[in-house]
Amino acid sequence: MSHENERAGTRQWTGLAVLVLPCVLASMDMSVMFVTLPSLTVDLRPSGSELLWIMDAYGFLLAGLLITMGTLGDRIGRRRVLLTGAAAFGLASTLAAWASSPEMLIATRALMGIAGATLAPSTLALIRNLFHDDRQRATAVGIWTAGFAGGAVVGPIVGGLLLEHFWWGSVFLINIPVMALLLCLGPLLLPEFRDPEPGSRFDLLGALLSLVAVLAVIYGIKTTAEHGIGWAGAGSLLAGMTAGALFLHRQRATPNAMINITLFRTRWFNVPLLIDALATFAMVGFSLFNWQFMQLVLGMSPLKSALWSLPTFLVMPVGIALAAGMAPRVGKPRVMTAGLLVAAAGYVGLTLIRPDSGILHLVCALTVVSLGIAGVAAIVTDVILSAAPPERAGAASSLAETSAEFGGALGIAILGSIGTAVYRAQMGSSAPANLTPEQLASAEATLGGAIDTARTLPAGAAEALRNAAFDAFIRELRIAAVLSAVLTVGGALLIARTLRPARTRTADLGPAPDRGRAPA
């Protein structure tokens, strides 16, 4: 049996479990802060600006260093980078748990982001080394994808349960035993792999430019979404795009490039990257609305709403299994197309939500979306990894993760901004006429502001304001669902037109082993 078609055994699947666990935690640490903020705010008393940095420091540094860490793993060894990052992540988590000031918590969250940036590209690249059979690798990547997505879902649940019995720092301590397990089992189960010809030296300037580009663009998107178009957001976006252009120019010119620009010349690499960003754009962007619907319209607690979101996670293995089983028979492009169309059907279901719709309507529609996206994400990531040479798998996986980060940031910014504009426009014409200017401004700002304002009004006026706010919010939710459906259908059409497998590749129906790939 050739090495390319060698099937994985118990050792490889156990190694996959070891790889998935830290990624679950890295994803959890992004979402767990939503339920932790009230408790730590009382204890540490951060300012408004400090509170934002407590939330953002982790995600910003993680996104900004993905490309650097993926390339570093290709050069010095993926297992080495992973285990070093795991040790640093555990140490930073310990410091965060006992942070005694907002500044200390911000610093430790930043350290966690730096360490967390080693996890995704290293684990994905190691999956490429562990699984050589196409179908098994697609399944393994799907399990990894479900773990990463599932961490964001279970984070608020785990956080809520811990905070009922322990102090806020306990949400960070759960990272330590998992990282310790990785440090113990990783050397035994995970193979080491590095580029045999990494070049003479590491491109430090390129790493700095990539960091500035990603951080500045994401910060500019976030600032523009929160405060509207202004000098800070526009300046940050301009600086990020300039740094990005300089980074790409340097990658073409230097012999020690972090990424091989010629990868982008093949449709089997650039189209899946775009699909990854589009799917994340829609799913992450729409999450702004489904959480508000559960907590503000239906009146659920954060823990209860997180529990109701579990079906969207539990259905992911089904989507992954279906995608992995269908890909060898009908081809990866058709599986991705079908997954996007299934997700679009779920978004269409979300356009039918009304203020009096129950939780089952929302959960069923979101579960359909999750079913489709799970299969797409697994196959898309596998296609991206397969399009790159094995010695560049770390850089390829980091680009896949970076595209997803950008997609999520853009989804929140663009869908959030459009939704806010729709909500304010409708509230401006439908809010009760007897509100004071201050009350009207609060009610027009957000749904939460309208609900808080309603608590200060007489019963009749409060009911009228709540109804107007609910109607305005449902309208913005429906528009976000329509846009998400259009994007996913557009992605399906793009795949159908651009990714046409060669008829001779009946076993894989994906990118050919060498044709169209960039040289090492």
Language-model segments: residues:
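Transmembrane-helix exit segments and adjacent C-terminal regions of multi-pass membrane proteins
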Residues: S2-A17, L21, S27, D382, ...
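Transmembrane core module of solute transporters
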Residues: L16-L61, W167, A232-G235, A243, ...
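C-terminal module of multi-pass small-molecule transporters
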Residues: A17, G77-A86, P102-E103, L119-T123, ...
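Transmembrane alpha-helical cores of Major Facilitator Superfamily
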Residues: V24, D56-F60, A87, G142-G150, ...
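Interfacial helix-cap and linker-helix signal at transmembrane-aqueous boundaries
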Residues: L40-T41, L72-G73, V158-F166, I221, ...
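MFS 12-TM fold signature
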Residues: L62, A88-A96, M112, V178-L182, ...
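Helix-loop-helix hairpins in multi-pass membrane proteins, especially solute transporters
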Residues: T71-L205
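Hydrophobic transmembrane-helix bundles of small-molecule transporters
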Residues: G142, E164-A282, F289, M300-P302, ...
